[in-house]
Structures are given as C-alpha cells and as structure tokens.
Amino acid sequence: MDSSPSPSPSAAAPAAADAGRYTFSPKLRWQPDVEEYFAAAYGRDRFARISEALAHPSRYSCIRVNTLKSSTDVVMHKLMDLVCEKGLSEGINGLEIIEQNGRDQSHERNSLIQKCPYAGLENVLFVQGSGPHVLQYNSQPDQSVKEIVVSRKCAESVLRGAQVYVPGVLACSSHVEKGDKVAVSVAVEQPVKDGGWAVGITRGTVLQGLQSDAHYEERKGLYIGQGIAAMSRSGIFRVLHGIAVEMTERVYKLPSFNDVLEGEIFLQNLPSVVAACVLDPQPGERILDMCAAPGGKTTAIAILMRDKGEVVALDRSHNKVMDILKLASEMDLNCIKAYKLDALKSVSKTDEATIVGMADSHCEAIKTLAEDSDPCPVTVDGKATNVVEDSSTTTVVQSEQPFLIEDKNPESKRYVSKAELRKNLRRMKNGPGRSNYSGGRVEKSKGFFPNSFDRVLLDAPCSALGLRPRLFAGEETLVSLKTHARYQRKMFDQAVKLVRPGGVIVYSTCTINPGENEALVRYALDTYKFLSLASQHPKVGGPGIVGSCELFNKTYTEEWLTEHEAELVQRFDPSSPVDTIGFFIAKFNVGEKED
C-alpha cells in the first residue's frame, strides 16, 4: 500500500496535527454516575478492561450447526472447500487470508475454521477473523484524504463486516465521485450544554480536509477502514437506499456468511448458544421462549429436542414473528409455533382458547420502534450482515432536509416530505412489512394457562451493554438502568407462573449491568422460595458478582449474590480470553409452588 498521506498546508491540516489521526483507538464514554456504579461492581481496573473490549468486535465468528440437517464435520469441510474454491487470498465472502510461499494450504484453512473447544458445544464452529490492522490511508501528495463520516450505529455494523449503506452516511468530502477511494470515520455522540449527548453533524455536511471540519478533533483515532465510493457525493445524499461505500480495507476483518449454507448453519454469539444448551430441553417437552426474535435460541432449542415436542416462541412485533417462522422453515423445523404476544401478557386471565385470531391488518404489520423489544443494532439500510442473536434493530439516520428521490427513470425525480421520510424510516426499522412476506399472517395469542410449560427461556430485553462493538454508552443513566430491571422483574413474574412445578427457568441478558443480572436473581430467590439456582452445563462463563451497592445518594441498596450463588450463574466478561459479548445466564429449578 502507499505511504501515509502528506497533505499540503494550503489544502489540509498540518501533518504534525494529524499524528495518530488515521487510527482506530476508541474510548467508550459513560455517564459519570453509571461509570462509578460499574467501577464499584467490578473494580476500576477490571471495568476499564471491559470498556476497552466493548469498543472492539470479537476476533472470530461463532457458527451453530443444524445437526438435524448436517454434522459439524460435514459443515466444517464444506466451509473449507468454499475457502479453497475462492482461493486462500479471498476467503469466505471477502475474508483475506494471506498465502505464504511454501505453506500448506490445508494448514491455512484449518487455522481459519476450528471446532469449539468447550465441552458440550460440539455443534459449534469458530471462524477466525483478524485485527486490529494498521492501515495506510492513501492520498496524493498535494491533496487531503477524501473522507466519508458515518453514524455510530453504521460504524458498529461495518466493524462487524457490513458495507456502508446510504442511510448511515452523515458527511462527505467535496468532489467525491463514484470509484474514488475514501477513508471512513465515525461521528460519536459528544456532550452538549444541556447535559445530554448529540452527534452534532447535519446530514449532508461537506468536509474540506481542514481542522475546521465538523468533529475534526473528535474523529481522531476513529477511522474504521477505507473503501471505494459506490456513488458520487450528490448521489449519496439524493437517494434513500443502496451501498455508499464498498469496504476494501478494514481495521477488523471478519468473515461474512450471507447466503452460505443456508439452513445448515446459523451465526450466533457463543453465550446465546450456551443459554439454549443450559435450558437442556428434552424431546417431547413443551418449551416457551418468551422473547424469541430473531429465532436463534428458538431454533437451537428445537434442534436440541430433535424437533420432537413443542417450542412456543413469542414476540410482540408482527415482522419479528415472521422472521422466526422464516428461520424455522429454512432449518426444516416443525415443532416451533410462533405467536404475536407481549411477554408481559403471556399468562392468560380467561378460559378462552389460546389462539384468538390472525394479525392481518396493515397497521398491525407496521409498528413503531417502541413496539420492538430487541435491544441492539445489527443492520444498516435494512441489509442484514452477520446477523446474530439479540441484534436486529435496523440502523437509520434521519436527515433534517427533504430527500430528492431518483427513480430508475433518470428523468423522474421528486422531493419527499419529512413526514413521508419518517414513515419510510419506520418501515425500515421494522423490516419489509407483512405484505412482502410469503403468507404474511401470524397467529395472535391471548396468553397461556399457568403451569403449562416444562421449561421457560426468558432472554429478556435489556440495556444491551454487553454487545460488541459499542462505540458509545452515554445514553444509559442509573434511572434508565433501574427501569430496565423493573421491566425484567415483571417478565420474570410471568415466567414463574407459566412453568410447571419440577420445571426449569433460564434467565439471560446481553448486558454487563448487575442490576439486570445478579439483582434479578436476588429478587427471584427472595420472592419465590420454591426457586433454587441450578448448576449449568456447559459452563463457559465466569462467576457472578458478590455483595451489594448503594445507589441514589445511599437511598437505595442493590443486593447481589452470595459466594455460593455466584458460582452457580454464568457471567461472560468481554475482556476475558473467551473474547465474546458481555452476557449473563441464571438457571432456576422450580419446586412445589405455594397455593
């Protein structure tokens, strides 16, 4: 690659000021009181390591094999063959593998794709990525680097392997044309005078390569790669959809599995696979997955049951229920029944039949983001890339200006009002809409009778503070974290009512917040004396947090776990050698209930 850029003083900032600029060295920012709370829970040094890890993606992808359609060995060899067919210099969907003279190619493939080393997870493969890479951002000696600035959520998706899509672009250098090489940086929220946070860049902003550019200093150390502009600057800010930049060099290189072995594999975070295994569903049982979208854990449970029995999957969003059914169909699973139902209303209060009708109206198919319970982003412009469990919210960036829409007919152009734009963005957030699905109908449920399930998985909506990569965390306050915890307790109350005596409840979250994890376990054990913590298999994570913490000027004490209880739960630390997301799992045995 070419040497680092040396822009002239007349056209760009002085070279000395750019020292270390074109790097990726993010620093995760928190609300001060939240940071103090986590530092008290983890210890200051450990929390600093966790914050550092959260700002970077894992260096591998975790693949769960559908063992009802294939085997781990067969899938492993199929993936190796794909690497061989594409050539070692290309890898799977763009993952670069450097071939060295005289080196055995089978060694390269074997080092890329490996079996999961943890006992009880024989159906899991790891595909290695790489990073962080030090990139050289090219420019002509007398010119500044052409740049595109993207939103934080867009950047988080790019770090996981996505391309840059149009809705994620905030600013662009002047005179960028299709085919130009551009550096991609990210605009992260900054503190504002009222005590809140804001990006502070209007969509469509022009970059001149000067220190006066928007977020010039703030973007130092926040360059995530470079690529080729797929359209001109004017095109990027004129259309609503499409790829804006094809990424050619990335700080982190992770494999993409779009359209690879569909139905045979599912890309899923390791702790999510573990949670389904810990539930230990048996063939013939009736299982409830209370917050099931997008269906990763649901299908994992069905496969563990050998597709024998019944797995009931719930979500309150029409489109997400359709996603669950679509995934079950791809994996040839017949025991899954998915219903549109808010998990907070999952216990029936009447003697009516469980199924009360079909959600077939347009207004029920298109809902606002507030109806969606998934906590974290993974797609850009509605394009799923490396879709993982717990991650399905579409990332969009709304402009303050009307868009000029360019139709297929180049002579046809029209302006779109902000009202119409907001409507389109809501649809993008919630997927393609019921009318674009085959069938298009989902069953609605009025709830289920108490004690009607053998096992219940509650993968609760949460603050999602364990997901990686995360470039900003300042939106969460102590009050909002406590609100999440109250909501989860209500959902857990429903789970307790639905599981039969002698059954099992598994509770999990993708957050590092002890208030949503250990404090929930404390609430459960203190409130329901017939519940007891159970040992877990497989056991990959570490112990829980012991003790308590005083909050809100010592007006509230949050109680956590005892030493013995902490050994029975699993807490996944993003900074640990497992190199996965922050996650928590607790398993409860249900004894004889009180009348």
Task: Please tell me what each predicted stretch does.
Residues 284, 307-309, 499-505:
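Short glycine-dipeptide loop
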Residues 264-265, 336, 531, 569:
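Short, conserved active-site loop motifs that form the nucleotide-linked donor/cofactor pocket
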Residues 333-343, 437-438:
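Conserved SAM-binding strand-loop segment of SAM-dependent methyltransferases
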Residues 327, 490-495:
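Short, conserved SAM-binding segment of the class I
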Residues 74-75, 193-196, 336-337, 468-469, ...:
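Intrinsically disordered, low-complexity regions enriched in proline, serine, glycine
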Residues 287, 311, 457:
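Short glycine-aspartate micro-motif
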Residues 100-106, 344-473, 477-481, 485, ...:
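C-terminal catalytic and target-recognition region of SAM-dependent MTase-like enzymes
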Residues 2-304, 314, 318, 322, ...:
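Glycine-rich nucleotide cofactor-binding entry segment
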